[in-house]
């Protein structure tokens, strides 16, 4: 399987966001604050010409580390037919490089669904704090990946 990761327009993320992360909810539930900010980065993983995975990165301080510059990863999703084949890790690794080059944050953080914890641990993220509930979505764990020695 040959995967190509490219920057994409936010509108291309909505079908996978809706189907995998907001199933049964209105399409508008997939529109996030700052989706269209010029500093927000949206990535797509493609096999041939088919979009099979997405990841969005937003310059945003982490509630636990608001004294440093952070970038939040959100809406990481992979088509069911391609899950557990390294697509999400590929997206995460590409996103880390692009974010470091373009935005120069001190760290990257995210709120992960509990069932995805091992994905983020495998990619160098450390859990912080206790698990918490996001209403109508489920139990999440916050993760952080330092990008410099001060974090």
Where does each model-flagged region fall?
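Short amphipathic alpha-helix that is part of the acyltransferase structural core
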Residues: 1-32, 36-52
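Conserved beta-strand in the GNAT
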Residues: 44, 50-61, 72-77
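A conserved beta-turn-beta hairpin within the catalytic core of GNAT-like acetyltransferases
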Residues: 60-73, 83, 102-106, 137
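Residue-level recognition of the GNAT/N-acetyltransferase active site
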Residues: 74, 79-80, 111-113
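Conserved acetyl-CoA-binding loop-helix of GNAT-fold acetyltransferases
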Residues: 78, 84-97
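Conserved GNAT acetyl-CoA-binding A-motif
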Residues: 92, 99-112
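Conserved catalytic-core motifs of GNAT/GCN5-like acyltransferases
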Residues: 109-111, 121, 126-142
